[in-house]
Amino acid sequence: MTIDEKMLKEQLVTITEEVITAGNLKKGDLFVLGCTTSEVVGGVIGKNSSAEVGQWIVSTLIEQLDKKGISLAVQGCEHINRALAMERRVAEEKGFEIVSVVPQLHAGGSCSVAAFEKFDEPVEVEHIVAQAGIDIGDTSIGMHVKHVQVPLRLSIRTLGAAHVTALYSRPKYIGGPRAHYETTQERNR
């Protein structure tokens, strides 16, 4: 399958803006990407990695999120225990444990490799708590998004050939029968 770089980037910007808006993300928040470029290019997860598509996706997200002061973490595959690439500064500020691994095309994946190349001072961490994220190709990012996770129905449901889903988080509702709650939409006003 041939991927149109311009279209992919435009669609990714639209998807990301929808997540930022729905999740009411702000400066200092953390955004997680799970992605299999194999699925984007029409293959099977883990079997047809595309370094080029990984570069397009990660560079687009970094550019878009940096403008808003939102940090990116990129989930690797199960061959590196789904460790995440991120900036050392962010890992240290948030108190995440740094682990020792350098992602490779077939052990971490294209997007992890791209993030490691594009970040100023990349590190890998084992666990994070992100406010929201995008999952390109059904890689399962839920383990990295803060509770309570809210699935988001996107206007664009595929990127290339990959199914795309997204999550954002909201505070837990607590209290009894008299409690009232502010919705995400009310917070966005």
UniProtKB/Swiss-Prot annotation:
Signal sequence region: none
SUPFAM superfamilies with a match to the protein in the record: TTHA0583/YokD-like
Gene3D superfamilies according to UniProt: Hypothetical protein TT1679 (3.40.50.10360)
Listed NCBIfam families: TIGR01440 family protein
Membership in a protein family: Belongs to the UPF0340 family.
Name of the protein: UPF0340 protein EF_1967
Source species of the chain: Enterococcus faecalis (strain ATCC 700802 / V583)
